[in-house]
Amino acid sequence: MRLARKVALITGGTSGIGRATSLLFSREGAKVAVSGRNKDRGQDVVKEIIAAGGEAVFVSTDVRFPDQCRRTVEETVDAFGRIDILFNSAGVLFANTVPDCTEEEWDLTLDVNLKGAYLMSKYTIPIMAAQGGGIIIHNGSGWGLVGGAAAASYCASKGGVVLLTRAMAIDHARQGIRVNCICPGDVDTPMLIDDASKRNMPFDKYLDEAAVRPMGRIGTPDEIASATLFLASDDSSFMTGASLVVDGGGIA
């Protein structure tokens, strides 16, 4: 097991990539704190982990708020004694250009996607430093590396995540903390389906457009979880500050 005796805290762990990663990390031996806003979905993930013989707890968190992020870290340590891996996977996506983007959409996107990663890291880093190290993984995006149509607020937030990753990697390497970013392309998640709806585009057409990429399809949450596992394991022991693109060749 690649994560035996490790403790992982995963935000956005109730659906999509976060859910798949929670389940995979547990299968690889980690104790998992599943964090998210939807209690019912979170408890379902925890029950699935426990039924398979793993250990998990659900922690209700809205990553926009400092007090909730601090409490989430504290509850994880109370439950499992430490935090070895933080995966900041909570995210939102709005289809907008700058003129179309409302201030509410802009603020929500930056607050969840970027500020949430900052806050969770802020309260986790002292724990990791005190225990001699740890691993932080941010969920970025291919659209944090290149521009995307009608995704202004999302691109801005994910570009910030990529640069935050690099800055944190420099600041905390000597504390034994590695910081990397996973950058998925389009993935078959509820967020992607919702994005298609916001663009008034049938999901089948969305899939047809995705087929132009070299591999001719969108990704699955399990595929992104597997790449995230690599970043969370000793297999990536000499990697920090990296953005790992997993997108079927979309930005190649």
Language-model regions: role of each:
Residues 87, 173, 178, 239-241:
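Short, small/polar-rich loop/turn modules that mediate ligand/substrate recognition or access, typified
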Residues 126, 170-174, 237:
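Alpha-helical segment proximal to the catalytic Tyr-Lys
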Residues 97-98, 102-110, 209:
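Substrate-binding pocket helix/loop in short-chain dehydrogenase/reductase
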Residues 2, 80, 118, 133, ...:
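C-terminal substrate-recognition "lid" of short-chain dehydrogenase/reductases
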Residues 121, 157, 165:
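Active-site helix of classical SDR
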Residues 141:
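Residue(s) in the substrate-gating loop at a strand-loop-helix junction
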Residues 7, 14-15, 38:
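Conserved glycine-rich cofactor-binding loop
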